[in-house]
Amino acid sequence: MKHLNKLFAAVCIFVGLSSQAQDSNNPWAISFGANAVDTRVSAATKVEDQISQYFNVEDNWNILPSISYINVTRHISNGFSFGVTGSINKIKKFVNTREGGVGEYTVTNPGDFSYYSADGLIKWNFIPGYIVDPYVHVGGGYTWIEDGNTGTVNGGLGVTFWFSEMVGLTLQSTYKQSFDERADRALPNAVPSHLQHFAGLTFKFGGKDTDGDGIYDKDDACPEVAGLKQFNGCPDTDGDGIIDGSDACPEVAG
């Protein structure tokens, strides 16, 4: 675990030094932080019971006290991006089905079972460009809980709160429908459907600005010479409103 935390810290430092806003200019983003696994959704049969304790962190959420997920995404176009997520956890709180369908849902520790997942996703930021940046996502993956393993179909919601154009806080909830939905949900061999929540920092990067004038190379008419935005990145040394490349006397206003 110590080595994993060091790896995440190194990634954080590297990305933090080179990050920009994710869009067609800066298409890459990396997120990392903590995740929580909640098994109540498959223990309950009624929708109201499945979501009634959505925020019951103390009783239902399994959380590792360390960085426990990493996500990398690539912007495609029109708010769409695709990515991959890897996560680890420990299952210490397992919500059991009700005996005979009545009574309370009990929570037991099945034995500190290990949890691993690897998932792919397609994400749509439906109102991009704002400080509050919500999105929906769908995808699929594979989950391991102790001796059990199976594929899942995933879907959920998320939102990123941008502190700056390159750093934000991302919150996400994902429902994972298990292909191994055994009636008894018995661990350690079964992998029941569950919710997985994520909270972490997001850094965006990937843009190229060779001359450092704040205009990305793909939009810069003079990508190797620092210039002005109003001239598409070309310089006007003498400030006479004529770019140097078209100015017969570029150092004398005329």
Give names to the regions the model predicted:
Residues 21-73:
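Short glycine/proline- and aromatic-enriched beta-strand/turn motifs that initiate or cap beta-hairpins
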Residues 26, 64-68, 112-118, 132, ...:
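Residues that define the transmembrane beta-barrel architecture of outer-membrane proteins
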Residues 29-31, 193-213:
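Outer-membrane beta-barrel "beta-signal"
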Residues 32-34, 70-74, 84, 120-124, ...:
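Residues on the lipid-exposed face of transmembrane beta-strands in outer-membrane beta-barrel proteins
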Residues 42-50, 94-103, 148-153, 181-188:
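Outer-membrane beta-barrel translocator domains and adjoining extracellular loop/strand segments
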Residues 79-82, 129-132, 161-169, 209:
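Repeated loop/turn-to-beta-strand initiation elements of outer-membrane beta-barrel proteins
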Residues 205-254:
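Extracellular calcium-associated, cysteine-rich motifs in secreted modular proteins
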